[in-house]
Amino acid sequence: MLVLVSLVLCLTGFCLLQWALKERKIVKGLPPGPRPKPIIGNLLDLPPPGALDWLHWLKHKELYGPISSVTIFGQTIIIINGHRVANELMEKRSGVHSSRPHVPIAELAGWQYTLGFIPYDSRLRAYRRALHQEMGNATSISKYHNILDMETHRLLFRILKTPDCLMQHLRKEAGSIILRITYGYITEPEAYDPLIDLVDKAMEDFAQVILPGGWLVNFIPMLKYLPSWFPGCDWQRRAKAFKQRAKAMTDIPYAFVKQQHEQQKHIPSYVSRLLEQNNIKLGSEEELVVKWSAQSIYGGGAETSVSVFACFFQVMALHLNVQKKAQEEIDRVVGASRLPDLSDCKNLPYINAVVKEVLRWHPVAPMGVAHASSKEDIYHRYVIPKGAILVPNIWAMAHDPDFYHNAMDFEPERFLKSGRNEQNPEYDPHQFIFGFGRRTCPGQHLVSANLSLGVARVLAVFNITNAVRDGKKVPISPEFSPGVISRPAPFELSIQVRNAECKRLIEAVGMKFPWEESHAEALAQLRI
């Protein structure tokens, strides 16, 4: 008991000392915000558990304007609720505001090397060079068009067979695309796949790691030195389990590619091309860059695609008029004798507008990903101190009435040159949905291509409406989960094939893309 009391007293004393030292460093002239309390600062002003943080921080815009601040245990956090502030700080001044905040739980949980957590340094530049070379523009992703063609067609087939398993099918499609592109890994076409299962569980861990305000150790780093048996420190056991899965998610598929490459059985992929281009030594910095940039592709690509597609299906059932107009465009431009392909997308302006509006109406990452300032800066009359965390409220920007007419409504027409927008369509959400400046998502072109093709094909062959139970429509409430990656709350739909010809087109997938033997067995035999 005496030992516990001593530890508590030491912890309290250390926290007070840490706060006192930070208090001396606080610079006058921060952006406005709620008055901080001694020691804890604005800890009690954080969103409560389960709250939608983008709506919580939107209140700051009403109270303080497009830029505001809070301080937690001496750490300054800048809340950005406006396009102009975000563009000025994170685009035009990206040389100053492109780092990432230090997140102790990321290291404890084994995620410190993923793209979203590493600071702006030579390692990040190495990641981005490798990723840009593979998927940095529309031309570089053309080598993946056949994979997108195959997996979106297979998605249609799975939905046709079991429409009630929509989310499972979306995860299978996204996982199959990303794992094939990144590692040359062929997933199980229908059954359980061990690698998809592993990475999905690891990504569930990641969602917990990045939960805003979810880990006190991020505000009081010295808590990491307390033993896991200490009262209130059971989070350390969770972090240890997360670390094991993060390591497995990174090491196992990388080892799979190396083995396949050595046996000359590999399918060309992101990792295999980097292995061929570089003399990569075991345990080297180059190997770390390859392994972790590859791992980052799944988090950035698969999670985004699943969430956006889920939102798309929900919103189509809510807006049948939009669905009908989109189907009329596809029927007129593509016809009924084939599925749309990527070459059609440039001739489908309404489909492209639907994709943009899905991205805008509910951004997949409503609060974006936090930036950090590498040196002190001045914005208008406000001081942005070195080490400040910048949090862009993407949802607020996507619903800014100064940029979007009837911002809460789902209106793809806002992006077309017609009616009130004949001269200037409204602001393209691609300009901010995928991040800012030097931290823009490097896989955005791949994600956009998959969304455009998937949306066009789904609407070409399916009608999406409310589910019916006991003769009555099941209402759909557009509610969303909190967190960095936000998805629609569970909902029910009716997904019916439009006609017999559409059914024939879907079922032709086996002729065009014969099912392949998966790599699940090879993965099971892998020894690392």
Swiss-Prot record:
Its cofactor is heme. The chain crosses the membrane at residues 2-21. Glycans are attached at residues 137, 450, 463. It is an enzyme of class 1 (oxidoreductase). GO terms for molecular function: heme binding; iron ion binding; monooxygenase activity; oxidoreductase activity, acting on paired donors, with incorporation or reduction of molecular oxygen. Its EC number is 1.-.-.-. Heme binds at residue 441. Keywords: Glycoprotein, Heme, Iron, Membrane, Metal-binding, Monooxygenase, Oxidoreductase, Transmembrane, Transmembrane helix. InterPro entries: Cyt_P450 (IPR001128), Cyt_P450_CS (IPR017972), Cyt_P450_E_grp-I (IPR002401), Cyt_P450_sf (IPR036396), Cytochrome_P450_fung (IPR050364). It is found in: Membrane. Pfam families: p450. It is a single-pass membrane protein. Its main location: membrane. Disruption phenotype: Does not affecct the production of 2,4'-dihydroxy-3'-methoxypropiophenone or 4'-hydroxy-3'-methoxypropiophenone. GO terms for cellular component: membrane. The keyword Transmembrane applies. Belongs to the cytochrome P450 family. Cytochrome P450 monooxygenase; part of the gene cluster that mediates the biosynthesis of 2,4'-dihydroxy-3'-methoxypropiophenone. The first step of the pathway is the conversion of acetate into acetyl-CoA by the acyl-CoA ligase ppsA. Acetyl-CoA is then used as a starter unit by the polyketide synthase ppsB and condensed with 4 malonyl-CoA unit to produce the pentaketide backbone. During polyketide extension, the polykedite chain is probably reduced and dehydrated by the KR and PT domains, respectively. This is Cytochrome P450 monooxygenase ppsD.
